[in-house]
Amino acid sequence: MTLPVPLQFKGAPGSPYTRKMLALLRYRRIPYKLLIGDQSTAENLPEAKVGLLPTFYLPNGDGKLEAVVDSTPLIRRFEQDFSGRETIPADPVLTFINYLLEDYGDEWLTKAMFHYRWYYDADIQKAGKILPRWRGLNESSQQLDKMQAYVAERQITRLYVVGSNDITAPVIEDSYVRFLEIFDKIIEKQTFMFGNRPSSADFAIYAQLTQLAKFDPTPAKICLDKAPRVYAWTDVVDDLSGNPADADGFIGRDELGDVLSDMLTEVGRTYVPALLANAQAMMKGEDQMETTIDGRQWVQPTFPYQGKCLQWIRAMFNELSEGDQGFVRALLNGTGCEPLVSSS
């Protein structure tokens, strides 16, 4: 079924996943209508089962609008419904690695985003002031002050959910710095992860950087000091409607190792052990996962959604041909990502 345009969706400037989809729609030149604050209420639109941003309002099989969330499957749906300027490489090997790196951005790099925003005083103060004002520009100062206190308290008390605490803070922060240094080297060679046109993984990385590099003061200073190229890249990706999206814009699979080996090693160093420990804890019915990441203790509540993430990664690997599976295994050898494809 062809989707009607403009696509309607609810979002917020401080939501990285809103920014992910907004930039992707701009790049793909898909008309959209972004609803901020109470604009979605005025439209009398359906409510999502889980209140996440962004929320898209799309017709179901009966033609009735339904609220749809989760950026990763939405991107794949739009790849089917809109032709041209696709963000999923055609090569199955690139498709799999792109999916893995998109998941890393969505699920691991976001830990740094939440951590910095609600762990340090300067970041807490800025987010507390600005987030309510994005939703309520016309609210009174008194009401906004109340919202500032409410938002900050709610988010700080929920930091443990994403794994940010005094034990894990050094792991998260060191991982963020390494990511910046690795990504800086990649975009010195080529503009995007897979060449000269963006993939969905680029938009996932960009999404977190709209906050880490461009909004929250502590990680923004780190980015500006250590990787100003990444800081500038985030501005560029904001609107890629002028990118030519050349047919040969994605690199070949034989170039993946030279370009992405360090990034894949970082994924294997941090995100993979978290995924595996989470899955193991869930299998045992435990409420908390404990493991070692980067040689240090990691403790956080089990995360059912990331249990699904591991299943989806392995399912996508299983869909590859035997030859492509062999190529991926060879590519991931020595990166720490091997368990993702050896126990699937």
Regions found by a protein language model. Give the residues of each.
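GST-like domain detector, emphasizing the conserved glutathione-binding G-site
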Residues: M1-Q142, M193, A213-K214, S261, ...
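Amphipathic, non-membrane alpha-helical segments in soluble helical-bundle scaffolds
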Residues: K64, A169-E173, P198, A227
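A non-catalytic, amphipathic alpha-helix used as a structural packing/dimerization or gating element
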Residues: V93, I97-L100, V171-R178, I182, ...
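Structural signal for well-ordered, non-membrane alpha-helices
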Residues: D106, L180-D184, D238
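Divalent-metal (Mg2+/Mn2+/Ca2+)-assisted nucleotide/phosphate chemistry catalytic cores
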Residues: Y119, D123-E173
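Short N-terminal edge-element motif at the start of the domain
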Residues: L159-G195
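GST superfamily/GST-like fold recognition
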Residues: M193-A213
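Active-site/pore-lining binding-face segments in mid-to-C-terminal subdomains
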Residues: Y206-Q297
